[in-house]
From Swiss-Prot:
Membrane topology: Multi-pass membrane protein
PROSITE patterns on file: NA_NEUROTRAN_SYMP_3
Extent of Acidic residues compositional bias: 687-699
GO molecular function, one term: metal ion binding
Family affiliation: Belongs to the sodium:neurotransmitter symporter (SNF) (TC 2.A.22) family.
Name of the protein described by the UniProt record: Sodium-dependent transporter snf-5
Cytoplasmic compartment residues: 1-84, 141-162, 307-314, 387-396, 473-495, 553-578, 638-728
Binding residue positions for Na(+) 1: 97, 100, 469
Compositional bias annotation for Low complexity: 29-50, 60-73
Length: 728
């Protein structure tokens, strides 16, 4: 009877960390004394007896000593503290909002056109299978299983590697700083469309036009296609008053003095909207319309993340679903325009398979995929941490990949159908009107829209779609850092406005340089350097840490906990449990990412070959931005060494799996005696749990009872011969 009583009492005090005390049977008198002590602490008994998990007892030995539970909070309490999406559909929509962005509309179409047309889909879809889907699936798994932000996740794997989690956070911050500039330009276009400017940007009779260098697109066509050859140029003596002479030289129209001329829509964007100075170091004062637009956009971004994941999920119904509707509307409208067939044929119908043998084609496919999916930005991990732990992440990863690719294909179709119409209307070939990047969105497409019936409507629909795509991505990027602060400083969960205002203000102040007249050149620097190299480095580090340090077998066990066991051999072979993903995360994806890292060093110096506009400081500061997230890793290594010393813990704990990790109990159940003996060195709380509150003894006891923590001095011996036991 004494043994039975001791078993019952011990089962109530079961903890995840176990160590061997002695091979002898427990003394009944000691057990009785401990029982009396436990009976005087009724509140602690009631809270802890439901936390027992006999699966963590080693059956090879008869007596073990247990210590306090090691999870910081029980799962049910943690879910109450941390925000979450209303349902899995909202999580998918918000993830799509981060992945599907402006690059799907203005980068993908021109990259596809320049790299083989429809043949570009072969390397793009191949890279999506080899890199895109595994990367998204991996980041969803990492975030959802732990239910924490990236720095906390990697700190729990090994505290010394906390900086790996911060890498993606800083990449997201760098992208958010300049990404909102594009959203600001788009918002200015939307406002000006409502003011009637859609009828003004297609001709040269406006105050902002340079009368000596402004031409219409029709004039540009005449300049470019005149047959009289003169050396390396073509001279056209126009009967029009402006310009009276133009030369087509080295790919651009020039006037008689050798000055480049530009179309009316180009001048509207560059002269009226951007208002650039002579170079990146010539700041020239503020561009007040851009300054005002940025201020409003930052205000809207702050409001979008102020209420957390639940509100973000609701916003995604509009910011994500509406762009899909609008892009279909634009595609249908473009298809029914005269000349659209020529544009669609250039995009879909004329594959150039010889491009598949060129390295640049595959490189461009990889770059487009990385930028489009936002892998390595910390955002996908952060968003998935708000998702329920049993959510089907493999299904969601497939949806994100399919949704992103669909937007690229349909958006590209809408763009090229419209370009075909514009080429027919101006008497040019499609190749003559194709532009890349910003020019496609802010110059060529508006030019085409003004020639359609009801031009203001189509212009507004196009820029509204861009605004929603950009805003949804910006909100997700800014929220990444805020999530990290909420996790490491829980007291701010109920005062989120402090974190949101502070973080948005910091990014806003840094981004003020974009609202100067040199802002366009600084934007180009951020766009060129901020995300590519650093995001790929982040992916490599995350994969290496999780697959080789945390362990690929543990990752596979995490998958089983999240999505359950494979239903049959077929789903086990190609589904969430497929060994393909394990091999991919260990070898294929890191190799692909390292190739991208190497290729990122191959670029033109100076940028665009214009040392007068882009001096050496452009590339120097650009590379500093690229390496900034990487520098974060050793900085946090040093900080954790200092933190460990100040807390009086052994430095060995910096290289050990922490008790707060979601799989610690499962993994510790298989530890050897020597490994179990080392677990006592691990801290029972996160550093921020010790620093954030100063509790009295009674408050501490109450909190321990609520969280399932038992005072470290209270131990109980357990007879593992009990039949109430199973191996995990």
């Amino acid at each position: 009877m004494a043994d039975s009583g001791s078993n019952e009492e011990a089962m109530k005090r079961q903890a995840p960390s176990v160590k061997f005390d002695s091979p002898s049977k427990p003394d009944p008198q000691q057990v009785s004394q401990q029982s009396n002590q436990l009976s005087s602490q009724k509140s602690i008994q009631q809270s802890t007896q439901s936390k027992i998990d006999p699966s963590r007892i080693d059956t090879k030995n008869t007596t073990v000593t247990t210590t306090r539970p090691t999870l910081d909070t029980p799962p049910e309490e943690e879910e109450e503290k941390r925000d979450g999406f209303g349902n899995s559909f909202e999580f998918v929509l918000t993830s799509l909002g981060l992945a599907v962005g402006l690059g799907n509309i203005w980068r993908f179409p021109t990259r596809a056109y320049n790299n083989g047309g429809s043949a570009f889909l072969i390397p793009y879809l191949t890279c999506a299978f080899l890199f895109g889907l595994p990367a998204v699936y991996f980041e969803f798994l990492t975030g959802q299983y732990q239910g924490k932000s990236p720095p906390v996740i990697f700190r729990r794997v090994r505290p010394i590697l906390e900086g790996v989690g911060w890498m993606g956070v800083f990449v997201a911050a760098l992208v958010a700083i300049y990404y909102i500039v594009i959203v600001s330009w788009i918002s200015i276009y939307m406002i000006n469309i409502c003011r009637g400017h859609f009828a003004l940007w297609s001709h040269c009779n406006n105050d902002w036009n340079n009368g000596t260098s402004c031409i219409t697109m029709a004039d540009q066509y005449l300049c470019k296609n005149h047959t009289k050859v003169m050396a390396n140029s073509t001279l056209w003596n126009s009967s029009l008053p402006i310009p009276d002479k133009m030369v087509y030289f080295n790919g651009a129209c020039q006037d008689a003095n050798g000055t480049d001329v530009s179309t009316a829509t180009e001048q509207y964007f560059m002269t009226y909207i951007v208002q650039p100075s002579s170079g990146m170091l010539d700041f020239g004062g503020f561009n007040w319309p851009v300054f005002a637009a940025m201020s409003v956009c930052w205000l809207l971004t702050g409001l979008g993340i102020l209420k957390g994941a639940k509100i973000m999920g609701k916003i995604s119904y509009v910011s994500v679903l509406v762009p899909y509707v609008l892009v279909v509307v634009l595609f249908i409208n473009g298809v029914f325009q005269d000349g659209s067939g020529v544009g669609l044929e250039m995009y879909f119908g004329t594959p150039n398979y010889t491009k598949l043998y060129e390295q640049d084609t595959w490189t461009e496919a990889l770059k487009q995929l990385c930028f489009s999916l936002s892998v390595g930005h910390g955002g996908l991990i952060s968003l998935s941490s708000y998702s329920p732990k049993r959510n089907n992440i493999f299904r969601d990863a497939l949806i994100v990949i399919i949704g992103d690719t669909t937007m690229s294909l349909v958006g590209g179709g809408a763009v090229f159908a419209t370009l075909g119409y514009l080429a027919k209307a101006t008497g040019q070939d499609v190749k003559d009107v194709v532009k890349s990047g910003l020019s496609l969105a802010f110059v060529v497409y508006p030019e085409a829209m003004t020639r359609m019936p009801v031009p203001w409507l189509w212009c507004f629909i196009f820029f509204l779609m861009l605004f929603l795509l950009g805003a949804s991505t910006e909100i997700a990027l800014v929220d990444v850092f805020c999530s990290c602060i909420y996790d490491q400083y829980p007291r701010f969960r109920n005062r989120k406005w402090i974190v949101v205002i502070a973080w948005c203000s910091v990014l806003y102040c840094i981004g003020l340089v974009f609202s100067t007249r040199a802002g366009y050149y600084w934007f180009e620097m951020f766009d060129e350097y901020a995300a590519g190299f650093s995001s790929v480095c982040t992916v490599v580090c995350e994969l290496l840490v999780m697959m080789y340090i945390y362990g690929f077998r543990n990752v596979r066990d995490d998958i089983t906990e999240v999505v359950g066991h494979a239903r049959n051999k077929f789903t086990g072979a190609i589904g969430a449990h497929s060994w393909y993903f394990t091999a991919n995360w260990m070898v294929i994806s890191p190799s692909i990412a390292l190739i991208l890292v190497g290729l990122s060093f191959v670029r033109e110096y100076p940028y665009m070959g214009r040392h007068d506009i882009y001096p050496a400081v452009f590339d120097i500061f650009g590379w500093f931005l690229s390496f900034l997230p990487v520098i974060i890793v050793p900085i946090f290594m040093l900080l954790n060494f200092i933190r460990c010393r100040n807390r009086g813990h052994s430095y060995r704990t910096l290289f050990m799996l922490q008790k707060q990790h979601a799989s610690y109990r499962r993994i510790a159940a298989n530890y050897s005696k020597d490994q179990l003996a080392l677990q006592d060195q691990l801290p029972d709380k996160e550093p921020w749990d010790e620093e954030n509150v100063d509790l009295t003894d009674s408050e501490s006891e109450s909190r321990n009872a609520a969280s399932g923590d038992v005072p470290i001095d209270d131990v109980a011996t357990i007879d593992t011969s009990s039949t109430y036991h199973q191996v995990y």
